[in-house]
């Protein structure tokens, strides 16, 4: 008797799991780029996040900091990801 009940319960749960799954489209991410004077430090990503947030007034999910040389000077090259906002017409 117990095995029959367990079979019915497990079968019902399996059906719910298989039929209940919906496909969700991933939200697109947009990239924003900026640069600062100097080299990236240990907390370069945090510095980029603060700088880019202050400049664009957007909330960023993640930022990377890369050192580049422009006109014989080091620069922070900040590349930050945020959710894309729909264009308003």
From Swiss-Prot:
Disulfide bonds: 30-84, 40-65, 48-78, 63-80
UniProt keyword list: Antimicrobial, Disulfide bond, Fungicide, Plant defense, Secreted, Signal
One Pfam family named in its UniProt record: SCRL
UniProt superkingdom: Eukaryota
UniProt keyword Signal present: yes
Location in the cell: Secreted
GO CC aspect terms: extracellular region
GO biological process, one term: signal transduction
Signal peptide from the UniProt entry: 1-26
PANTHER family associated with the record: DEFENSIN-LIKE PROTEIN 241-RELATED, DEFENSIN-LIKE PROTEIN 245-RELATED
Family as reported in the entry's similarity comment: Belongs to the DEFL family.
Protein name (database record): Putative defensin-like protein 230
Organism: Arabidopsis thaliana
């Amino acid at each position: 008797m117990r095995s029959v009940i367990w079979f019915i319960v497990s079968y019902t749960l399996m059906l719910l799991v298989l039929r209940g799954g919906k496909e969700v489209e991933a939200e697109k991410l947009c990239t924003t780029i900026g640069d600062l004077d100097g080299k990236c430090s240990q907390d370069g990503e945090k510095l980029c996040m603060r700088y880019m947030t202050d400049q664009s007034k957007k909330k960023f999910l993640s930022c990377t900091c890369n050192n580049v040389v422009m006109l014989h000077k080091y620069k922070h090259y900040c590349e930050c990801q945020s959710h894309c906002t729909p264009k308003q017409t």
